[in-house]
Amino acid sequence: MAKRLDLKGVNIYYGSFHAVAEVTLSVLPRSVTAFIGPSGCGKTTVLRTLNRMHEVVPGGRVEGSLLLDDEDIYGPGVDPVGVRRAIGMVFQRPNPFPAMSIRDNVVAGLKLQGVRNRKVLDETAEYSLRGANLWDEVKDRLDRPGGGLSGGQQQRLCIARAIAVQPDVLLMDEPCSALDPISTMAIEELISELKQDYTIVIVTHNMQQAARVSDYTAFFNLEAVGKPGRLIEVDDTEKIFSNPSQKATEDYISGRFG
């Protein structure tokens, strides 16, 4: 668990459109790295590239090197499904299988892998729900539909589903944007706990959230409409928010644009 990601000279295309240019950065294990920047700057595109989710869009391709603990996840013969198992994704809006039970939501990935042993499935469901700080709230209704949970609980259910397959990295695409403040606080506390076991990358438009939950922050920006997004700087979160090295970063986090 908790592996390192290294991007070297990564360029991302959709057909002839150059979406993101020349990204080089390292994401360290057992830490939270926040991707920030204005809409359209490429931060979510880069996030999706980390587990090859961008490939579901026709024409999506990557140039450059993207390593998971020195293994090229775009190397010849590498199975994208295996990559997505090692690098899990939690999306912007909670997306549990609404008619499926809470228990079956959590172990859906294991069942797809062919696991049928009930004891293993039950133990994994409990372990994952505890890991997502949801067990005590749902342990007496595991057979009820996941769609019946509140929005915040559904998002934690999705996190439990992601960690059930024991990934090395967790990607989170604005995981709190659709949640109320209390649910947001619960997710932020959970992120701080999960980083003890996982490498976490989070995309957020909330500067206060980035400052609260992340150890490192990467700022992306767009030169102009039609131009590719670029990584402007990446550093310790405290430095990015107190003394950034680039004026564009300072302007963005101070609210002058974006």
From Swiss-Prot:
It is found in: Cell membrane. It comes from the Bacteria. Gene3D superfamilies: P-loop containing nucleotide triphosphate hydrolases (3.40.50.300). Keywords: ATP-binding, Cell membrane, Membrane, Nucleotide-binding, Phosphate transport, Translocase, Transport. GO terms for molecular function: ATP binding; ATP hydrolysis activity; ATPase-coupled phosphate ion transmembrane transporter activity. It is an enzyme of class 7 (translocase). This is Phosphate import ATP-binding protein PstB. It comes from Mycolicibacterium paratuberculosis (strain ATCC BAA-968 / K-10) (Mycobacterium paratuberculosis).
